[in-house]
């Protein structure tokens, strides 16, 4: 961990994770002391996503997942961490970082010309594609209860050269816009 900046209200850190072949992760993060300032929200909870926790059930071991809206280029999914995380805001932020890696691949993958093969022929996604997160950014706007249902609403911005970009907003059930996520994703067709 490298200390990049220590200010009165902001600090910045850089982390490089390495394995035998070199760097596998470069992380830059900034932290801010809470400030009582204006709170203006322009984004709104979409009207087409139903009630928190409603939708088609696709639960995972650690996450409750409800598909609220899925179409070409868009995935809106209610997510909730199954365990009680308590009131620690850092633990809540870490849990959101963990959950935010899921939905961007759905939105970009839905635009791929071969995605129907995966759905119609009951073939596993990994049998057709190789995927990875290339770049991932999160902006935390407001306090968030990750052990409650949060709507992750992501839209694909395109897919070219085996890379896609997804940008999404995360909303609390109250409609509060709690975070914004952007992710560049590798979606490469398997050749063997």
Regions found by a protein language model. Name each.
Residues 2-192:
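Terminal targeting signals and extreme-terminal segments of soluble enzymes
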């Amino acid at each position: 961990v490298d200390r990049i900046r220590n200010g009165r209200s902001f600090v910045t850190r850089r982390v490089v994770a390495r394995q035998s072949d070199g760097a596998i992760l470069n992380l830059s993060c900034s932290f801010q002391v809470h400030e009582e300032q204006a709170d203006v929200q322009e984004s709104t909870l979409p009207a087409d996503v139903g009630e928190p926790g409603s939708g088609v059930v696709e639960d995972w071991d650690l996450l409750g997942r409800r598909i609220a809206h899925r179409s070409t280029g868009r995935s809106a999914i209610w997510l909730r961490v199954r365990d009680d995380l308590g009131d620690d805001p850092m633990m809540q932020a870490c849990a959101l970082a963990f959950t935010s890696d899921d939905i961007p691949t759905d939105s970009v993958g839905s635009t791929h010309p071969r995605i129907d093969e995966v759905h119609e022929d009951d073939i596993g996604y990994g049998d057709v594609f190789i995927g990875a997160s290339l770049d991932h950014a999160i902006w935390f706007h407001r306090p968030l209860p990750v052990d409650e249902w949060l709507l992750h609403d992501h839209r694909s911005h395109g897919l070219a050269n085996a890379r896609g970009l997804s940008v999404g907003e995360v909303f609390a059930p109250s409609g509060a816009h709690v975070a914004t996520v952007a992710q560049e994703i590798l979606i490469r067709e398997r050749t063997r």
